[in-house]
């Protein structure tokens, strides 16, 4: 959208509504056609959404003297989630009560409690006015097209914000575990479970439960690569392992039930939804008229802070859920979603519950899970079509043609949408292959690997999963008696799990790890797929950029500890936009900044000379056991991006043969196919040997058997391709 056009009142909202209305019917049909398979991403995102909300509710219950509990946070998440899934613009966006909202409500409660003419009794009524002002400010921002500025956020800001959220989650987990060793407030310290010995026992048992959930949860996500168990069992554990582990460790907490006091381990504390104290907030609108006029006007101050906070969090969460790398085919709706958020904020304030907004990392996690689902459906269809064609002695051109036909059969053409990335594959690439008329030998033509190379990453864009997960959160309100049986330490373990799970794939985190890696071991980075900047940016420059980003991160994290003002830490993230645009170019070369702050997550392949596997063996080693595992390898987990990886099949001479590619022309075919998905691949030239990397004549014993050329420019066997040396070991 043009910036001048975006500031025309209502222009952005009208464009968003028009674009999404054309897709609305298909949003529901697409989800329903997925059948029971939609339950896997639904359950996955439900637990990622519900467990933090329950924990935040318990935190609010302590900080507001019971005025707000887990019942209210669950109701807010469910209500806003259902409304957004039905009439929202971007259905991939997940709404929920977030940590900044908890901090802000704690501040407002302490302020109200300290004022005799307001007091804790009018706290919810005053927050109703705060939410009313917040909603009006969000309306104003949406009408004026303020969301246009979100597009200026680069990887620098996004990854720093992702690490900051991970730090806040880990901080909450550590704080919760430490509290397990103390006596909670508003309890009888003379009770048996609060005696020093039992308090220590509660803390140690809680440490076991939280660590157990963290360890088993991380392991279960990699179940598809296990060597043991049937494929369906490994897939089930990978999809549902974390919620299953919550149940398992909850059951373990009941083992010593005869030998310990009843309160060990400690469990969630929240009233049932039918308890007298749980529904007093629903009539808070009647008490709003009792708030003094002065405090109604003063409510603009916290409302402005919350509006800025929601504008940033909601828009960035939506941006991360619909990145370009996800290849979404339907238009965004930033302005309309912000406008709808204003309505939801007012609604929540009028019924006395904390408002919900777009949350990170749940939103990109939702998109990633739907990409995995769509990938499984497409992959199975294309593999079946290819095998059927091969059994009929088809040529390679006919095989690819049948796969494209199968692909198009699964697509649902829409009006006003981006075209599919695979459209025209047969005409643009297959007919250019020199051996397109050659018969296919299934013993050397790896169908599944070929499908993985040509199948673009696409997301099953629909509203069903968001609607179902919101309804499941609503079901948690009625299931509160069961939820209260979960040990609080298990939830702290889940917080730590979400923090750690968000780190891999974050280039900022990878550079931090690289800084602490011994210089003699840094070459190990090149033995696996790695970010392209490792080869293009000098190590000294990389270190300076990382140290700047780390210092900025610590400043942002320190601000979160400042009373009241701590909630405005997103302003520091927003300040990175002018810093990146006007300040950093004075200290770093433009080419280096481009690689370190790239819009896409691009990786270079591992270097074959680091191991002695034949090319065919390495090619097969890079394939995955099943479709779900493929997406585990392709996705980063911090921002949910797609890793752009140069195919190993690009190497090798034009006269040789590779696994998955018929001799000679197959290499050229795959070069064109991969180039089609990522045009930048053809512009990258990678180092060939360990001696190149080290910049000297020293060669690893593992590289003595020969070197495989990796330059896509020499993929056809020609020489003369430019060779670029790695800069990882260089200081300038």
Curated annotation (Swiss-Prot):
Side Cytoplasmic, residues: 1-37, 99-123, 179-197, 256-291, 361-463, 578-732
BP GO annotations: monoatomic anion transport
Pfam families per UniProt: HCO3_cotransp
Compartments (UniProt record): Membrane
Membrane topology type: Multi-pass membrane protein
GO function terms (MF aspect): solute:inorganic anion antiporter activity
Any one of the GO CC terms: plasma membrane
Membrane spanning stretches: 38-58, 78-98, 124-144, 158-178, 198-218, 235-255, 292-312, 340-360, 464-484, 557-577
Record InterPro entries: HCO3_transpt-like_TM_dom (IPR011531), HCO3_transpt_euk (IPR003020)
N-acetylmethionine, modified sites: 1
Region ranges (Disordered): 695-732
Function in brief: Probable boron transporter. Boron is essential for maintaining the integrity of plants cell walls.
Name of protein: Probable boron transporter 3
Origin species: Arabidopsis thaliana
Gene: BOR3
């Amino acid at each position: 959208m043009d910036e001048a056009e975006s500031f025309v009142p209502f222009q952005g909202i009208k464009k968003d509504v028009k674009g999404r209305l054309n897709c609305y019917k298909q949003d529901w049909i697409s989800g329903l056609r997925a059948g029971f398979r939609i339950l896997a991403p639904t359950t996955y995102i439900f637990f990622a959404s519900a467990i933090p909300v329950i924990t935040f509710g318990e935190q609010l219950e302590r900080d507001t003297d019971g005025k707000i509990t887990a019942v209210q946070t669950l109701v807010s998440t469910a209500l806003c989630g259902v409304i957004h899934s039905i009439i929202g613009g971007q259905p991939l966006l997940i709404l929920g009560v977030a940590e900044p909202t908890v901090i802000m409500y704690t501040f407002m409660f302490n302020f109200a409690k300290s004022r005799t003419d307001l007091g804790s009794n009018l706290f919810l009524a005053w927050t109703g006015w705060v939410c009313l002002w917040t909603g009006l400010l969000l309306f104003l921002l949406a009408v004026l097209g303020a969301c246009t500025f979100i597009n200026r956020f680069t990887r620098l800001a996004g990854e720093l914000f992702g690490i900051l959220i991970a730090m806040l989650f880990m901080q909450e987990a550590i704080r919760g575990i430490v509290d397990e060793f103390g006596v909670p407030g508003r309890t009888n310290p003379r009770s048996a479970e609060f005696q020093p010995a039992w308090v220590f026992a509660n803390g140690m048992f809680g440490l076991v439960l939280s660590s157990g959930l963290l360890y088993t949860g991380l392991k279960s996500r990699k179940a598809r690569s296990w060597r043991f168990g049937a494929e369906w069992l490994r897939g089930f554990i990978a999809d549902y392992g974390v919620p299953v582990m919550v149940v398992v460790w909850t059951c373990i907490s009941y083992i010593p039930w005869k030998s310990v006091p009843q309160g060990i381990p400690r469990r969630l504390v929240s009233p049932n939804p039918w308890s007298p104290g749980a529904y007093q907030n629903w009539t808070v609108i009647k008490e709003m008229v009792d708030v003094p006029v002065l405090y109604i006007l003063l409510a603009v101050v916290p409302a402005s802070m919350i509006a800025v906070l929601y504008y940033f969090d909601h828009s960035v969460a939506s941006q991360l859920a619909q990145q370009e790398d996800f290849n979404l085919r339907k238009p965004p709706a930033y302005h309309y979603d912000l406008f709808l958020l204003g309505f939801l904020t007012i609604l929540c304030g009028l019924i006395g519950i904390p408002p919900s907004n777009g949350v990170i990392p749940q939103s990109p996690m939702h998109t990633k899970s739907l990409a995995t689902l769509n990938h499984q459906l497409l992959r199975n269809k294309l593999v079946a079509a290819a095998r059927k064609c091969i059994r009929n002695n088809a040529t390679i051109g006919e095989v690819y043609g049948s796969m494209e036909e199968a692909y198009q059969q699964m697509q649902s053409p829409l009006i006003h949408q981006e075209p599919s990335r695979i459209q025209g594959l047969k005409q643009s690439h297959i007919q250019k292959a020199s051996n397109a008329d050659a018969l296919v030998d299934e013993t050397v033509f790896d169908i599944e690997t070929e499908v993985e190379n040509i199948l673009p990453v696409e997301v099953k864009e629909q509203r069903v999963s968001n609607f179902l997960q919101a309804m499941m959160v609503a079901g948690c309100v009625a299931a509160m008696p069961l939820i209260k049986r979960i040990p609080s330490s298990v939830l702290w373990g889940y917080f730590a799990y979400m923090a750690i799970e968000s780190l891999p794939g974050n280039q900022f985190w990878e550079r931090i790890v690289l800084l602490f890696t011994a210089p003699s071991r840094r070459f190990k980075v090149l033995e696996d797929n790695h970010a392209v900047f490792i080869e293009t940016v000098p190590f000294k420059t990389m270190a300076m950029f990382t140290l700047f980003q780390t210092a900025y991160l610590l400043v942002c994290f320190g601000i979160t500890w400042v009373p009241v003002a701590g909630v405005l830490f997103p302003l520091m993230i927003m300040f990175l936009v002018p810093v990146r645009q006007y300040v950093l170019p004075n200290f770093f070369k433009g080419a280096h900044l481009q690689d370190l702050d790239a819009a896409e997550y691009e990786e270079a392949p591992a270097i074959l000379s680091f191991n002695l596997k034949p090319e065919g063996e390495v090619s097969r080693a890079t394939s995955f056991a099943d479709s779900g595992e493929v997406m585990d390898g392709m996705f980063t987990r911090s921002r949910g991006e797609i890793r752009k990886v140069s195919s190993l099949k690009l190497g090798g001479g034009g006269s040789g043969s590779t696994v998955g590619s018929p001799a000679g022309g197959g290499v050229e075919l795959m070069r064109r196919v991969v180039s089609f998905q990522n045009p930048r691949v053809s512009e990258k030239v990678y180092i060939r040997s360990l001696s190149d990397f080290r910049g000297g004549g020293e060669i690893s014993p593992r590289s003595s058997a020969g070197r495989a050329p990796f330059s896509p420019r020499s993929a056809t066997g020609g020489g003369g391709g430019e060779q670029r040396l790695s800069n990882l070991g260089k200081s300038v």
